[in-house]
Amino acid sequence: MKIGFDHEKYLEEQSKYILERVDSYDKLYLEFGGKLFNDRHAMRVLPGFDENAKIKLLHKLKEKVEVVICVYAGDIERNKIRGDFGITYDMDVLRLIDDLRTYELEVNSVVITRYNGQPATTVFINKLERRGIKVYKHKSTKGYPTDVDTIVSEEGYGQNPYIETTKPIVVVTAPGPGSGKLATCLSQLYHESKRGNAAGYSKFETFPVWNVPLKHPLNIAYEAATVDLKDVNMLDSFHMDAYNKVTVNYNRDIESFPVLKRIIEKITGKESIYKSPTDMGVNRVGFGIVDDDAVKEASKQEIIRRYFKTGCDYKKGYADKETFDRSKLIMEEVDLKETDRKVVLPAREKSAKLKMATDENEICPVVALELSDGTILTGKSSDLMDGAAAVIINAIKYLANISDDIYLISPVILEPIMNLKSKTFNEKNISLNCEEVLTALSISAATNPTAQVAMEKLPLLRGCQAHATTILSRADDTTLGKLGVDVTCDPNYPSESLYYNN
């Protein structure tokens, strides 16, 4: 992988800029957009970016930082899933708290936004409070978003309880978009002003990158990643009017800026120092780019990856046709084809050959994987194991220089697992998935030195690219994610079965 981003330079620049911003206030409410942990999108489009860069940045500032986590009551009620982890938003709040504590960051509280006594949310509140987590309940803001006089009054933000904080930087984060981070920040600004405290608001969002051209693949990759939110990158007209400088922001921030500016001015009683949405941000990621060509190429690959993901989401019913069509338009805008992703064609060609050889009507599930040296290997589904498991075994055998005809896992281990699935669990599909095969491999490694050598090659798969000719099971998708393999799928199910495909 060609490095295009200087992680250390970015950390230095970013921490310095946040501290400069907080110097203007007694307290800074910093809205954190995107992912605090495991930001694999940023890692993919900015080769050299650390997926945990943001949390390491906060760890660096830990003496000055405390964290407030927002979650929208409606998302808890409908069991909204965080796509990259496959867990619900309420569970992700718990995960966030644990992970923040690991980095020695103080979690102040959880804010339940737009709370109206929803039953599942009330259970979640009880769970948090009984584990010693402070919870604040915020209702919908009366008058929002147009009636500024009502919003900035005791009927509006005044209805929300004041969140007691002690440190100069309050990071407001959430499991995902639409969780009420901005409303929580503004509500706090209102209460701080009532108490005579000079508090400020800033936004930390990595994408779009304000000082990179509008049509740069890096910014277009952000549109591809948020195609379901219908985010569109735009030139910040407010910034152009104020400074005669071209910067990039996205439609929601630009559209909401006039009202946001009026709310801040109503709260503080003076003219806002922010002349544009770009002014509000503290993002310095653009200054860490050291190889623009490497970033462009990585971003193009991410656009293709997102296109495949949206296609699969459409097939599963998670995305509408408009969203899928939009992802196609983004591909066309950058003049990209599906086969510009190197692993796509080898997977499809292998699948087509197998289909011809077996004379099957259904698509033959094949997974192709590209190693760091450019070698592409394939694995096919069989009665013994599925395609994802097969390609991982083939890859580690290749990396360990183990001959194809040598078995890494003894039938003595495999057969009892398959018997357990078929005879005890009465499962229809008894071929082993990726996790099951790797578990069997780890058992074999205890007595088989060759299996141990192969096991030791698994970390070399991190950052590798893969493509499947059919939609992978959730179990395989999760396991490949844990291995650090970026996988895409053609939007086809492996069979006509409805339930047993999952």
From Swiss-Prot:
InterPro entries: DUF1846 (IPR014999), DUF1846_C (IPR048441), DUF1846_N (IPR048496). It comes from Clostridium botulinum (strain Alaska E43 / Type E3). Gene3D superfamilies: dip2346 domain like (3.10.630.10), Domain of unknown function (DUF1846), C-terminal subdomain (3.40.140.40). It comes from the Bacteria. Belongs to the UPF0371 family. It holds the Pfam family DUF1846_C. This is UPF0371 protein CLH_2534.
